[in-house]
Amino acid sequence: MFQPILPCVFRGIIEGERYPVVMSTYLGVMGRVLLQNTSFFSSLLNEMAHKFNQEMDQLLGNMIEMWVDRMDNITQPEGRKLSALALLSLLPSDNSVIQDKFCGIINISVEGLHYVMTEDPETGTYKDCMLISHLEEPKVTEDEEPPTEQDKRKKMLALKDPVHAVSLQQFIYEKLKAQQELLGEQGFQSLMETVDTEIVTQLQEFLQGF
């Protein structure tokens, strides 16, 4: 349905769309494409590389850079988490361009964790507050209406949405583990050294228990 407008969306991101609300929308659309249809994203990247007369890797690097740079345009926690999931989906990779942007991807991921994680005061562990469980039934007080069919449909849709179905914490852990296995311990450590030590410390706190 959105296919005809995607080149325009891609161009808007690369050229740094100046209106924050529009840029936020563009990044949200591209995040969903990247996360949920990788093969289509690859063909779009190939098409845009021809239009921009650039190598695909170079264009991908430019897109990630602009994404990281304009992350503050995204004000909703859902959008922050979507961006983190989308960029993390590029890992594991031995592509030098993606490795070059690894620091930015981790920065966005940790920012995303700050937006969506809540601490359990009893256990001191963190959990992703955006996750919706199949089993969870909202508690209805006497003053509230029970959920309507539309509410139930909304929940079923939400359960198919990675933002509500995938734990950002778990996703980061699995992607970093896969990257470590791909590069080996030494290569992975070199990559982690490109990330600010404060960000690494925050990441370790969020991933306690994994």
What are these regions (language model features)?
Residues 1-210:
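Alpha-solenoid helical-repeat scaffold
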